Amino acid sequence: MPFHHEKLIVYQRALEFATWSQDLMEGLKKKTSTRDHLERAGDSIALNIAEGNGKFSKKDRARFFQIAHGSALESAACLDLLVARRCCAGSAIGRGKSILEEIVRMLFTMLDQLGCRVAENASEYGERADQEEEAEAD
């Protein structure tokens, strides 16, 4: 009988990313700190989804899902760094970025359903920025 987290599509995508990123890293010629960080951040996505799904309180579940969300964004940044440092071609990371985008969307939805927003309200930010500009102009 599978564990509950194994039934989650987001968890399955996290495993898919871990497999994809492992294949990418094995093809890299040099070992870098970014490569090591990608492995840790990629693993963290699946691990935090699993742990969070096992928590009983919404607050605890949300905390682990937020960490998984952050790890997915970190993984995307690691891919960008590998390209920027010429460790791999930009065309080599497209599939990984696509998987990560899907994971981020799913985690955002899960957090939203738990009543936890992971982003500030854009209209409030825009209004505050406008108010600050007006105050500076005076």
What are these regions (language model features)?
Residues 1-138:
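Amphipathic alpha-helical assembly/interaction segments
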